[in-house]
A protein has these predicted regions:
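Glycine/tyrosine- and acidic-biased, solvent-exposed loop/turn segments at the edges of beta-strands
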Residues: 1-63
Length: 63
């Protein structure tokens, strides 16, 4: 599965996040062509803290 791992503090108190990118049919795609994303925030031990669904525009910014 394609995703981007971002190391650093997250808004919900996590230590890192993973961003998974999807097209309009929820197929996992490269971030450059994504229209939707799921952002998962984790503690350093892998415990899931928060999961957020978002819509991305052509510049991959949350709408």
């Amino acid at each position: 599965m394609k995703y981007k791992k971002v190391i650093g503090n997250t808004p919900s108190g996590g230590d890192y996040s993973e961003i998974y990118y999807f097209d309009s049919n929820l197929n996992n795609v490269d971030e450059k062509v994504a229209s939707k994303c799921i952002i998962r925030e984790f503690k350093s031990d892998g415990t899931l803290v928060q999961e957020t669904f978002g819509f991305c525009n052509k510049d991959n910014k949350l709408l």
